[in-house]
């Protein structure tokens, strides 16, 4: 390839969350203060709407890359630019979303114990002791839970999906999902204060399913249970 052809990525335009078209250099320059050498991207604006709203509220930008061919293109751009990393908008909890406050050692130790307790309660309620659970103190107190999938795991999944088109198995390497629990949320605080409560398991399942639903990855079986559970919660709330 000629140098002009191999450097075509430099002239590639990326559509951002505001509908503006930017070059790679523009994307990196506009966001270097908040996430240097990282470009967040969206593959499905409807499915990832919760994450998009979080990014907009925090003043963080992302680009829209909805096509299957975008994945190998991103890898090509990363190879051409040392240190550059593309991360899907739901790959991790950005530091900007986290509450930043200095605490003493005693408080940190208590937070660690609370996080371990919450993880155990959620795993037991959901019935999955292998579930990855991370507890964070997020600025948005209204958000109780969310699902993240590491970029490495997602790319492996994408590769397996392409492989399955030629007779391979797409479920050989399941995505490494993490349930992120917001310690600042009122419902999560309730779970922590009532870890052995009668209604706590139902609440944990509801928060997990809501996170999966927002992530667009709720299975038909869990969807059926979620609808039934939601109906039961409303009956209890209104005495029906």
What are these regions (language model features)?
Residues 1-5, 9:
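Single conserved hydrophobic/aromatic residue that forms the stacking wall/gate
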Residues 7, 204-211:
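Short alpha-helical scaffolding segments that buttress acidic/His motifs in well-ordered protein cores
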Residues 29, 47-61, 79-81, 161-167, ...:
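Short, solvent-exposed amphipathic alpha-helical segments in soluble enzyme
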Residues 36-38, 43:
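Long, structured protein-protein interaction/assembly regions in large complexes
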Residues 41, 60-66:
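Short hydrophobic alpha-helical runs that function as membrane-insertion/retention elements
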Residues 70-141:
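Conserved phosphate-handling catalytic cores of large alpha/beta enzymes
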Residues 117-192:
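Charge-patterned, long linear interaction tracts outside catalytic cores
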Residues 216-240:
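Long, highly charged low-complexity segments enriched in Glu/Asp and Lys/Arg with interspersed Ser/Thr
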């Amino acid at each position: 390839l000629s140098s002009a052809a191999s450097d075509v990525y430099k002239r590639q335009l990326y559509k951002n969350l505001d509908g503006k078209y930017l070059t790679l250099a523009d994307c990196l320059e506009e966001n270097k203060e908040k996430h240097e050498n990282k470009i967040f991207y969206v593959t499905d604006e409807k499915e990832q709407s919760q994450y998009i709203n979080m990014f907009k509220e925090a003043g963080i930008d992302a680009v829209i890359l909805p096509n299957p061919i975008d994945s190998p293109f991103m890898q090509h751009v990363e190879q051409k630019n040392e240190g550059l990393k593309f991360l899907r908008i739901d790959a991790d909890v950005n530091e900007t979303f986290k509450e930043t406050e200095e605490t003493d050692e005693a408080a940190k130790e208590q937070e660690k114990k609370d996080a371990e307790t919450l993880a155990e309660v959620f795993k037991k309620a959901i019935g999955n002791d292998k579930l990855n659970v991370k507890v964070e103190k997020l600025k948005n107190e209204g958000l109780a839970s969310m699902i993240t999938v590491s970029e490495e795991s997602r790319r492996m999944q994408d590769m397996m999906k392409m492989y399955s088109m030629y007779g391979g198995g797409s479920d050989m390497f399941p995505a490494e999902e993490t349930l992120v629990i917001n310690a600042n949320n009122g419902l999560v605080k309730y779970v922590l204060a009532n870890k052995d409560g009668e209604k706590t398991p139902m609440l944990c399942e509801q928060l997990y399913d809501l996170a999966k639903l927002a992530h667009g990855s709720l299975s038909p079986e869990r969807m059926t249970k979620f609808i039934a559970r939601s109906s039961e919660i409303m009956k209890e709330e209104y005495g029906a």
